[in-house]
């Protein structure tokens, strides 16, 4: 069915209040967008990331009388009569089909493919990870996930143990197992991530070699040949003492979720215990790798 979209611009501080106003006026869903496409930095746990200038977009049923909606919104103290807004009729589409059509198998490095379940596998002889795009966790489309997958593809993982610190969907741990790792361990603070990783591991036939833990449950003496952490610069710095002890002597470390402008401070947090490689950049993001001294 067709929809009507109403967009208004405000400050990040007022976005939540105007979101409530749109819902009270009849919106069936709300979306926040950055007006200026500013890079996203770390939110605090549980925080909704908003920007200095934020577009608040309400979606309304096509039968909605938008004059009535505008009249209701004009009564809000943050808006007032004649407030700036844009109303747009959205054409009727098969939105689910259009969303699915945007996702294709993606190749990382020489061997590894990430494939949505509804697409044909491009190369049956390649290392294929079946993973459907989702809203919350990594699927390979973000530059940081791509950087980590390419790094794993270039390693000899046969018989190795790999820790995926901040596992999300489990994409990195599962890729490592498909690339030959004997065992992978996924750690995440979010129980939903643990469940997503478990489901994806079962889909890819590697659940018997994947251990998953919330931080409070992880074994104390846990070690691995390879440790990868695709989280964010702030946590990477703060958790450096914890992450640094996970690789065995001579083990490998891969870090991402870091903007290029943040790379130096993250490198500084690990330089004492690791011999670091040159930083690799992709679309303003970077990957930091090294070997345990």
Curated annotation (Swiss-Prot):
One of its GO terms (biological process) is methylation. Its main location: cytoplasm. GO terms for cellular component: cytosol. Its EC number is 2.1.1.-. InterPro entries: Ribosomal_L11_MeTrfase_PrmA, Ribosomal_PrmA_MeTrfase, SAM-dependent_MTases_sf. CDD domains: AdoMet_MTases (cd02440). S-adenosyl-L-methionine binds at residues 145, 166, 188, 230. GO terms for molecular function: protein-lysine N-methyltransferase activity. SUPFAM superfamilies: S-adenosyl-L-methionine-dependent methyltransferases (SSF53335). It is found in: Cytoplasm. It catalyses: L-lysyl-[protein] + 3 S-adenosyl-L-methionine = N(6),N(6),N(6)-trimethyl-L-lysyl-[protein] + 3 S-adenosyl-L-homocysteine + 3 H(+). It is an enzyme of class 2 (transferase). Belongs to the methyltransferase superfamily. PrmA family. Methylates ribosomal protein L11. HAMAP family: Methyltr_PrmA. This is Ribosomal protein L11 methyltransferase. It comes from Salmonella dublin (strain CT_02021853). The gene is prmA.
């Amino acid at each position: 069915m067709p929809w009507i979209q109403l967009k208004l611009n405000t400050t990040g501080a007022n976005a939540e209040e105007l979101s409530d106003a749109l819902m009270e006026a009849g919106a069936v869903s709300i979306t926040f967008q950055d007006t200026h496409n500013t890079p996203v930095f770390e939110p605090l746990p549980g925080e909704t990331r908003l920007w200095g200038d934020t577009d608040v977009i309400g979606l309304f049923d096509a039968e909605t009388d938008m004059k009535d909606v505008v009249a209701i919104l004009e009564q809000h103290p943050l808006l007032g009569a004649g407030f700036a807004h844009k109303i747009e009729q959205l054409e009727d589409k098969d939105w689910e089909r259009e969303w699915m059509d945007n996702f294709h198998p993606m190749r990382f490095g020489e061997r590894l493919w990430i494939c949505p379940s509804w697409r044909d596998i491009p190369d049956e002889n390649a290392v294929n990870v079946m993973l459907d795009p989702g809203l919350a966790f990594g699927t390979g489309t973000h530059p940081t996930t791509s950087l980590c997958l390419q790094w794993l593809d270039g390693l000899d993982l046969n018989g190795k143990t790999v820790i995926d610190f901040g596992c999300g969907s489990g994409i990195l741990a599962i890729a490592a197992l498909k690339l030959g790792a004997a065992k992978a361990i996924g750690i995440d603070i979010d129980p939903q991530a643990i469940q997503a990783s478990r489901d994806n591991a079962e889909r890819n036939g590697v659940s018997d070699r994947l251990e998953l833990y919330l931080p409070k449950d992880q074994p104390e003496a846990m070690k691995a040949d390879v440790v990868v952490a695709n989280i964010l610069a702030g946590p990477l710095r703060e958790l450096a003492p914890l992450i640094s002890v996970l690789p065995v002597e001579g083990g490998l470390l891969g870090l991402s979720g870091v903007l290029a402008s943040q790379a130096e401070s993250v490198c500084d947090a690990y330089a004492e215990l690791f011999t670091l490689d040159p930083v690799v950049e992709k679309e303003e993001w970077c990957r930091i790798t090294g070997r345990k001294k």
